[in-house]
A protein has these predicted regions:
Chain B
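A short beta-strand-turn-helix
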Residues: 45-67
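Thiol/disulfide oxidoreductase modules built on the thioredoxin-like
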Residues: 113-118, 125-175
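Aromatic-flanked redox-active Cys/Sec active sites in thiol-based oxidoreductases
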Residues: 70-75
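Short gly/ser/thr-rich secondary-structure transition/capping motifs
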Residues: 27-28, 48-55, 122-125
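Structural microenvironment flanking redox-active thiols in thiol-disulfide oxidoreductases
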Residues: 80-116, 126-132
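Hydrophobic beta-strand anchors of alpha/beta hydrolase catalytic cores
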Residues: 68-69, 96
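N-terminal targeting signals for export/organelle localization
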Residues: 1-48, 175
Length: 145, 175, 661
């Protein structure tokens, strides 16, 4: 209990000065690359990487300092000549599939791709049953009606 | 009959979802993103000193014996809470190398003056470069690094008193 | 005192829900054509209940307006220094208040149904009211037992702890109430569908009763989603208008189901086909509303828009979900086989096109559901994955593109059976527009595939939407047809906005010294200065940006970076310059150590069309309701007059001649 109280007290005292870091953002966190083609590549990649400190936002949509540092990594690596796929791979090797909003077929994500195929089959089946067969019957019914 | 079976499909799908959701509600929501770098060697890095009192840190500093790599920052509140535990680990003879994330020398010195200094070296990572390279997603986090420089264990969040034996055991295992 | 009145009203309303449920169930016991004496209480119970639930909500509203800090809910979510409008909207900016709003709307719509709907057979009406009472009872229980909004504090708090600054916006006044009303409107569709299923009265008359509720709910959902999208767009500060976030998907899924339901109800009303399917969609649409509530409230999924989460309450809602939806699907599985097949139709016919649209909407719904819940599934195995736009966009487009193509043609087809040869000109026109626009745009540059397809489809759809009016006297076109035309045109407008935003947006991020200028597209943006400003419960730095288009006269934009002090949190207040052909979106960031300021500016061509389109779609829905209701009223008047005349003739005696019907 006393520890808790102490923690709360410390928190209150420390809050104004310590709640957030006051460091300026990394060079490429809020600055674009000179080359518009490279910047477009970086921007497309950043929109598909998850900000790890945020709730369901890409690093391209976040003001969290860590998202800024991740943007800096992406832009400086693109500038150094790495491909977006390499950078995504580098991050997945560190944070797992969680960091990428673009699921790739793997043993943990295959249903994401199998189910749509299944849905296509079901859709085709339903349409054939409901519309395909009806055409023949409908023609017959049309004549008698 | 085929048609009758089809009518049960929505219920079956719903039951599957309800079961899953019910199970997930009983689980603690895991907000941590674990590093995939466990078992991998530390990436190469060399960080400058975080303040005048201690040298900076590089990969070479982890050679020799198992050590702790503590990711922290002076602006991070849970880091205050774990300071006594780091002191306790140091008292047990554990060498702790710190990496200060997005920090200023004056703030680092001030923090260490107030809450104690358990570190042998502190590198300054102003743009979270090393943090990202080892798959850490927040402060504080603590990694066990063996004598060959391989990452063996990751502790996410502040170290509580109850976590100290676990960390000592992991250091032992990394011998 | 007000809180106690509110609480008492809630308990009374819950008791009336029991009465409504039991009394309604007795209607089922009546022999056909007769009325069970015990069934007569259901309607009054629903009406009085509506008054009580609305009263309870009004009491909470009052407590928030006066910042009654002896109430726990007010103390933990409000603050005396907040502007009045945010005090009021803050009533539903928290879990308990939003659930009370939900229940209030539920009771209100139940009351309206009981008070005004006289067309249904009494048995079906009784069953419907019983189901509605059962649903309401669950939510009263949830409020009273697990989230009492009227709980008092033992000692009144000296000050409230405030409202999340992201919610201190006019968006909170519009978005949640409309969305909730839409969710809840679907509960009436659900009750009606269950009532019809239980009494096997699935027929065009039932569909005509169901239709205004579905349309109404769908209009509200459309407006709610549109408002929510615009709100997120300007409030989150990065110019995104749709993130495929779980909470957004939770609002999209009921909309998709309701859209399918609305079209299938039309088929049932006009042609007595698709009976089982309509019932199924009625259950599905409300399931999606409840699922949405569950996902938002339980916090099982991580979302940027989740503001009040609690796993225990999640368990309660999951229980309700299991009870209602599990029960409904069970009854569906047992009963639906007994509902006679509806009328048949050819593949090339209005019905055929509507079935296609229904199946595609359901497929999109399946994809969104899968993508939303998949992370939950893998977390059960301790694997964390993220599913985002790179998945949702193409996966839903697979089904959306054929759907949009058929949507262009569908309204031109005749009911029952049609010949494609009759529509040669229209088909050629639509194909030419799709291909022509895509070819034209690709000629000017390289653009991503989906926006490109979107542009082609938008052009074709905009023209095709107006084709049903061709060769008709515009004055004689029924109001409901106008509704359809405008709604379909609205989809084209929204699609155009989305495609343009995706293909032609420009972004400029830069560190600027005061006095410095950045160029973006046709616009020169000059940072004239940065000044501190203060609001009632925040302080901020405000940038003065002078924007000149092609060297014209400057327009001043003032984006702010705000710091709220209760609770302590910072937000970016974007500044927007709206032109007819797009928006300039400006945000001020931090100051770098060298004194330069971070500014972010976007030029988003035609982005506003996304929301104009949404409004047009909703307007189309409104017109459709107006058209249907006016036809119904006229028909009822005519029937009443006929009855009156027949009664008069009877009174005149047997000598009078029998009028021809």
């Amino acid at each position: 209990m006393i520890r808790l109280l102490l923690a709360v007290l410390l928190g209150v005292l420390a809050l104004p000065t310590l709640a957030q870091d006051t460091m300026p953002p990394a060079p490429y966190a809020y600055n674009q690359l000179e080359d518009p083609r490279l910047e477009a590549e970086a921007s497309a990649l950043m929109h598909t990487l998850r900000c790890l400190k945020c709730q369901s936002q890409s690093i391209a949509d976040s003001d969290a300092p860590m998202a800024g540092d991740m943007r800096h990594q992406v832009r400086s690596r693109i500038l150094a000549g790495e491909s977006p796929a390499e950078i995504r791979g580098w991050l997945i090797a560190r944070y797992g599939d969680y960091v990428s909003y673009e699921p790739e077929v793997s043993k943990s994500t295959w249903p994401l791709f199998a189910v749509p195929v299944l849905v296509i089959l079901v859709v085709a089946g339903v349409l054939l049953r409901r519309l395909g067969k009806r055409r023949n019957e409908g023609d017959g019914a049309g004549e008698t009606a | 009959m085929g048609k009758r079976l089809w009518l049960w499909a929505p219920l079956a799908l719903f039951a599957f979802f309800a079961g899953l959701a019910g199970y997930m509600l009983t689980q603690d929501k895991d907000e941590f993103v674990e590093s995939e770098m466990i078992g991998q060697p530390l990436p190469d890095f060399a960080l400058p000193a975080a303040f005048d009192g201690l040298p900076g840190a590089s990969k070479a500093d982890f050679a020799g014996s198992p050590k702790l790599l503590n990711i922290w920052a002076s602006w991070c509140l849970p880091c205050i809470a774990e300071a006594p535990q780091l002191e306790a680990l140091k008292a047990q003879g554990v060498e702790i190398i710190g990496i200060a994330i997005r920090d200023r020398p004056a703030d680092v010195a001030n923090f260490l003056g107030r809450y104690g200094n358990p570190y042998s070296r502190i590198g300054s990572d102003r743009i979270s470069e090393v943090q990202l390279a080892i798959g850490s997603s927040g402060v504080p986090e603590t990694f066990v690094i063996d004598a060959k420089g391989v990452i063996r264990y990751q502790h996410i969040g502040d170290i509580r008193e109850s976590d100290v034996p676990k960390l000592l055991a992991e250091l032992e295992k990394a011998q | 005192m007000t809180a106690e009145i509110g609480l008492a009203a809630l308990w009374l309303a819950a008791a009336l829900a029991v009465l409504q449920m039991v009394s309604g169930a007795f209607a089922l016991k009546a022999a056909p054509g007769e009325v069970n004496a015990l069934a007569m209480h259901a309607r009054p119970a629903a009406v009085v209940q509506a008054f009580l639930a609305v009263l309870a909500f009004a009491m909470l509203l009052y407590a928030f307006a006066t910042t009654d800090l002896s109430l726990k809910l007010v103390a933990s979510n409000s603050h005396s220094m907040k502007p009045l409008i945010y005090k009021l909207t803050g009533t539903w900016g928290n879990h308990e208040g939003s659930m009370l709003l939900w229940v209030g709307v539920l009771a209100l719509s139940g009351g309206l149904l009981a008070g005004f709907e006289k067309r249904l057979p009494e048995r079906t009406m009784g069953a419907t009211l019983a189901v509605q009472g059962f649903v309401a009872l669950g939510f009263y229980a949830f409020l009273l037992l697990a989230s009492n909004p009227f709980e008092r504090l033992p000692v009144p708090a000296p000050e409230g702890s405030g409202l999340n600054p992201l919610l201190q916006d006019i968006g909170l006044a519009i978005h949640p109430p409309t969305l909730y009303a839409g969710y809840v409107g679907l509960s009436v569709a659900f009750s009606l569908a269950m009532g019809a299923l239980l009494t096997r009265e699935v027929n065009p008359a039932f569909a005509r009763v169901l239709r205004p509720w579905v349309l109404g709910a769908w209009v509200l959902l459309t407006l709610g989603i549109t408002a929510g999208s615009y709100w997120a767009y300007y409030e989150l500060g990065w110019g995104g208008w749709w993130f495929w976030d779980p909470v957004e998907n939770a609002s999209l899924m009921p909309w998709l189901a309701a859209t399918a339901l609305m079209h299938s109800v039309s088929v049932l009303a006009a042609r007595d086909a698709l009976r089982t399917w309509t019932i199924m969609l009625g259950v599905l649409a409300f399931s999606m509303s409840m699922l949405g509530t569950f996902l938002v409230r339980s916090g099982v999924l991580t979302s940027v828009h989740a503001f009040a989460v609690d796993p225990e309450r999640g368990a309660f809602i999951l229980g309700l979900l299991g009870l209602y939806i599990g029960g409904a699907f069970t009854i569906f599985a047992l009963r639906a086989g007994a509902v006679a097949e509806g009328k048949r139709f050819a593949a090339v016919s209005r019905e055929g096109a509507l079935v296609f649209n229904n199946v595609m909407l359901s497929a999109i719904l399946a994809i969104v559901l899968l993508g939303t819940l998949y992370p939950l599934l893998t977390e059960a195995f301790d694997v964390r994955v993220s599913v985002g736009p790179p998945y949702f966009n193409p996966a839903s487009a697979i089904f959306a593109i054929p759907m949009l193509l058929v949507m262009a043609v569908g309204p031109l087809l005749r009911w029952r059976s049609d010949k494609p040869a009759r529509l040669q000109f229209e088909l050629a026109l639509i194909a030419a527009l799709v291909i022509g626009v895509i070819a034209l745009v690709s000629f000017f540059g390289q653009f991503p595939l989906l926006p490109l397809l979107g542009l082609g489809l938008a052009a074709a759809l905009a023209v095709a939407a107006l084709l049903p009016l061709r060769g008709r006297s515009l004055k004689r076109v029924p109001v409901a047809t106008w509704g359809m035309v405008i709604a379909h045109f609205g989809i084209a407008v929204a699609l155009f906005g989305m495609a343009c935003e995706g293909a032609f947006s420009k972004e400029r991020l830069a560190a600027v010294v005061p006095g410095g200028t950045e160029q973006i597209g046709d616009f020169a943006v000059t940072l004239e200065g940065v000044t501190p400003v203060a609001g009632p419960n925040w302080t901020a730095i405000e940038a003065r940006l002078a924007v000149r288009q092609n060297g014209g006269a400057p327009v001043i934009l003032t984006p702010q970076a705000r710091n709220f002090w209760s609770p302590p949190q910072s937000t970016s207040e974007s500044a927007l310059l709206t032109k007819w052909n797009g928006q300039l979106y400006a945000v001020i960031g931090q100051q770098a150590e060298d004194g330069r300021w971070q500014i972010r500016v976007w030029w988003k061509p035609f982005v506003t069309f996304i929301w104009y389109g949404g409004i047009l779609v909703a307007l189309g829905g409104l017109l459709s309701i107006a058209g249907r209701v006016s036809v119904d009223v006229r028909r009822r008047k005519a029937t009443a007059q006929g009855d009156q005349r027949r009664a008069d003739l009877d009174a005149l005696g047997a000598a009078a001649p029998v009028p021809a019907e």
